[in-house]
């Protein structure tokens, strides 16, 4: 094992006291301290002091006060600041990637590619919307009584203060999705990171201040549990909540936000499916399975967990998959050769182990993996499970780990019906060399995004969000405009 050397910037940052970033300043929390654990070792790497309710309120007031100035800034100037932030994240790419890898267990390669390179790309995309958020002029049909005329137009106006609740699996990239969309529309934002990954957004907020984003436009409030998030959501200054996370927590967020009439965007994951058609070889199927289900230890909201394979090829595919996964031995996320790191926190580690044991108890077949690795850290073997039926827990409950469930089908129509029987619908994929058939199935699958011969690829130009129990609203593309602006109509008589 050969780990990269941590940059001095990273070690110096870790030694600092950590709390909040409010009104352009770092400040210690007034709540309880909590440890930040490196999931590769199980050891604390830093301590963060949580905000108390007064600090949460002050962050919201800071964002509200900054809103009036920020919304009046010329739109191209807002876009220019987002471009500067993108350039700064690119300059600090390695330091931020190392910090994220330490906190989340993400391999350093993925941290560089996804957390940083994708964040930079999304910032630049959203910056390009500056000056392009437009309304319409409208012809109206009101009668003229004395020669008067009428016209009307619409305009998009920023909502106000956005509360962005960010999960632990992609703490920089998902925060940037929310931050960039809010800021380019003229909103300000208060970000609440997960207590498992609270550090990187503090550094991003510092860099945002350094490039000239005014104080109060971006605030970061830390805290364990849901109390601080609830305080932010219910604050009178909150105009919108953007949440990414679990279904159970998302339902609570929706209830709290809706009770006071606030806009809400929810991206909740679920139980995503992948369908492999019979024309593919077992080798092609296995390559697709690894891409769809095991990237980042399966800790991706859109990752596939249910795999539908032709019954006649099921055993051959699973035998080949078992051989391929043997090369994915988990290792240190700071080793550039590592393909699979630890799970991001102890709670998730315990949950995944519990679900694997449930599969055993229910009579499912563990094809490979299924065990924790000895030693320190939250490492699990990549696991493939051949389930008995659709009633297996692993076909219904989100695992969010390196565990994929496989079941055979005898007709493609049967497989489609079983895929759509889920209460969730964030993402799915169809794999086939028959593009005509794959495109037809993409129309029938009940999911917010359907990939063909690919999985878990996101592009800022393509809207992303869930159907059914997997969420409300869309991110990216032009769809984000509806969620961060108010559509105002103006009618004129002249």
Give the label of every model feature segment.
Residues 44-51, 66-72, 163-164, 274-277, ...:
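Short, well-ordered beta-strand elements within core beta-sheets of diverse protein domains
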Residues 42, 78, 100, 186, ...:
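Residue-level signal for inorganic ion chemistry
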Residues 134-284, 409:
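Rossmann-like NAD(P) dinucleotide-binding subdomain of oxidoreductase/dehydrogenase enzymes
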Residues 45-134:
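Glycine-rich loop-to-alpha-helix module at the N-terminal edge of alpha/beta enzyme cores
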Residues 248-389, 452:
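ALDH superfamily catalytic-core signature
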Residues 43-46, 238, 275, 356, ...:
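Conserved C-terminal structural/oligomerization subdomain of aldehyde/semialdehyde dehydrogenase
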Residues 1-40, 125:
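Hydrophobic face of amphipathic alpha-helices that form TPR/SEL1-like repeat modules
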Residues 67, 71, 86-93, 97, ...:
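Structural signal for hydrophobic packing residues in well-ordered secondary-structure cores
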């Amino acid at each position: 094992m050969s780990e990269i050397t941590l940059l001095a910037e990273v070690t110096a940052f870790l030694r600092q006291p950590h709390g909040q970033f409010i009104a352009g300043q770092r400040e210690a929390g007034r709540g309880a301290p909590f440890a930040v654990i490196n999931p590769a070792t199980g050891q604390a790497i830093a301590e963060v002091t949580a905000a108390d309710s007064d600090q949460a309120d002050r962050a919201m007031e800071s964002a509200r006060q900054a809103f009036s100035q920020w919304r009046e800034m010329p739109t191209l100037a807002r876009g220019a600041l987002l471009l500067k932030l993108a350039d700064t994240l690119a300059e600090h790419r390695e330091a931020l990637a190392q910090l994220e890898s330490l906190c989340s267990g993400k391999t350093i390669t993925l941290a560089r590619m996804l957390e940083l390179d994708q964040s930079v790309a999304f910032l630049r995309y959203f910056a390009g919307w500056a000056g392009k958020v437009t309304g319409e002029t409208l012809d109206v049909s009101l009668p003229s009584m004395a020669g008067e005329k009428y016209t009307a137009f619409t305009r998009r106006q920023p909502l106000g203060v956005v509360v962005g609740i960010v999960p632990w699996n992609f703490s920089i990239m998902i925060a940037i999705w929310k931050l960039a969309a809010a800021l380019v529309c003229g909103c300000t934002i208060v970000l609440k990171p997960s207590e498992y990954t609270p550090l990187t957004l503090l550094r991003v907020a510092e860099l945002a201040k350094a490039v000239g984003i005014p104080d109060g436009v971006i605030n970061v409030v830390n805290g364990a549990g849901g109390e601080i998030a609830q305080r932010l959501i219910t604050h009178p200054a909150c105009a919108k909540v953007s949440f990414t996370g679990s279904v159970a927590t998302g339902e609570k967020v929706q209830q709290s936000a809706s009770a006071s009439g606030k806009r809400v965007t929810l991206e909740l994951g679920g139980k995503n499916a992948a369908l492999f058609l019979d024309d593919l070889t077992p080798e092609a199927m296995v390559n697709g399975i690894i891409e769809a289900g095991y990237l980042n230890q399966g800790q991706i909201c859109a990752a596939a967990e249910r795999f539908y394979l032709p019954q006649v090829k099921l055993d051959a595919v699973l035998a080949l998959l078992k051989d391929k996964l043997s090369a994915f031995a988990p290792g240190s996320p700071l080793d550039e050769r590592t393909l699979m790191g630890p799970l991001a926190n102890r709670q998730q580690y315990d949950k995944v182990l519990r679900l694997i044991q449930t599969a055993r108890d229910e009579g499912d077949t563990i094809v490979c993996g299924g065990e924790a690795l000895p030693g320190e850290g939250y490492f699990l073997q990549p696991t493939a499970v051949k389930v008995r039926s659709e009633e297996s827990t692993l076909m219904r409950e989100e695992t969010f780990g390196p565990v994929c469930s496989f079941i055979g089908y005898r007709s493609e129509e049967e497989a489609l019906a079983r895929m759509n029987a889920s209460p969730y619908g964030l993402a799915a994929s169809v794999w086939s060399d028959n593009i005509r058939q794959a495109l037809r199935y993409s129309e029938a699958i009940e999911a917010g995004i359907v990939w063909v011969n690919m999985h878990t690829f996101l592009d800022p130009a393509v809207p992303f969000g869930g159907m059914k129990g997997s969420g409300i609203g869309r991110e990216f593309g032009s769809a984000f405009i509806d969620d961060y602006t108010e559509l105002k109509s103006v009618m004129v008589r002249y």
